Amino acid sequence: EQYPFLKSHVIDGKAVLPMAVMIEWMAHGAIHNNPGLRFHGFNDLRVLKGVTLEHGQSHTLQVMTGKSFKSGGVHVVPVELSGVAANGKQFVHCRARIVLAAKLPEGKVAMERVELQAYSRPIEEVYQPDRLFHGPDFHGIREVIGCSADGIASMVRPAPLPTDWIKQPLRNSWLSDPLALDSSFQLMILWSFERYKSASLPVFAGRYRQYLERFPESGAEIRIRVTNQSASKAAAEIDFVDPGSGALIARI
């Protein structure tokens, strides 16, 4: 009840904490212990054990931060999202090195869309059990611009206010945009179905850099270039682009 967004992220009858929300909470932990710095991104984020909840179940999570260190003009904070097992032992759900900066650098030039063909489904059929499991809170994809063996592109909605998803949020505004980030992972699922007839779920992100303190309120364009692929896994570069100015908002 405290986290109503979880009702829209259910797999096999269990609520699953989205990786995009893990990112938000870990970034908040890093910022909280390093006041005055801004969230710039992360390195080497890996989900080791997903956070799942059955109906009526609760689970205690802790964000653990290490000592920050400077590297290449930014501040790097080791962060872990941990839980407690039934035997009382603590274990790690997710870890990353959160990157903070005194001032966000100017964004790079956004990559061009890869060559795309028309997507095979109308947008009304994207959020169906045979494609995307996501409920209403995570219906972030407005339009699939196109899809091909090399990638996919889409227009996505912005996240609502944190209070729409969480009864007592840690902040009154997002550090990133969890709906935009989650939508990029959704697009990889759609791409995987088109290419290999199966879904892919995110477990690792090597590098994320954000060049604006906040995502545009109008939403974003997502451009994905698949760099490595097989029937069992795929790797991609993902750009979040301001559809109005063409500026690069963020890059995975």
Each language-model region and where it sits:
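Acyl-thioester-processing domains in fatty-acid/polyketide/NRPS systems
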Residues: 1-252
